[in-house]
A protein has these predicted regions:
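Amphipathic alpha-helical interaction segments
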Residues: 13-15, 186
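Sec-dependent N-terminal signal peptides
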Residues: 4-13
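Bacterial signal peptide processing site
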Residues: 17-21
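Extended, compositionally biased repeat/scaffold regions that form elongated interaction surfaces
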Residues: 23-188
Length: 188
């Protein structure tokens, strides 16, 4: 279970902090970052709280690439997706935390890739742990995020993950710019 939340945090950290890391730094982060379920959920909560505040800024100072969105999507059962979107450079990753009243519903993992190599399925809790322990999704993420020289050919490998957890999340729909997300999701 811990590896699922580690993966969730890795995507958020890579997305929020990418301009601060070179390829070696990102590779080290993906291989070595370790975080608890509690901490991963707190990062989501921080993002939600910031979106709901009235102090959001709209300026975008992107020293690398622009016009590509990173989507932080929190899903609730029987409702529309809750999205936190940031306009930042390079790839698009989607992080989904799915809310259910009953946490006994099997964990759901969906890997989504552009145009080809589509793979999705419903897994039990243990099957999902096994999947992530096998590093399949992490390898896809690393290939996409780190291979900047051959980025055009790697855009078909963009994973997304649904994590089912009995957590309460408010409805929200807001756009965040790169610097805002970077600040909001900064790990202390």
């Amino acid at each position: 279970m811990k590896s699922i939340y580690t993966f969730l945090l890795l995507i958020i950290v890579v997305s929020a902090c990418q301009s601060d890391f070179d390829n070696a730094d990102l590779d080290s982060l993906l291989r070595n970052q370790d975080v608890s379920k509690k901490r991963a959920l707190k990062i989501i909560e921080k993002a939600i709280a910031a979106v709901e505040s009235s102090e959001l800024k709209t300026s975008l100072k992107n020293e690398l690439r622009s016009n590509v969105k990173y989507n932080y999507t929190i899903y609730r059962s029987s409702s529309e997706p809750v999205k936190i979107t940031a306009d930042i450079h390079d790839e698009t990753y989607t992080v989904r935390a799915t809310y259910y009243i009953h946490d006994s519903i099997p964990y759901f993992m969906q890997g989504t890739m552009r145009d080809q190599d589509r793979a999705s399925g419903r897994y039990t809790h243990q099957e999902l742990i096994t999947y992530f322990n096998g590093k399949k999704v992490i390898k896809q993420l690393k290939k996409t995020a780190l291979n900047k020289e051959n980025r055009a050919s790697d855009l078909s490998h963009i994973p997304s993950v649904d994590i089912t957890e009995d957590i309460k999340q408010p409805d929200l729909d807001a756009l965040l710019r790169y610097e805002e997300v970077k600040s909001i999701l900064k790990i202390q």
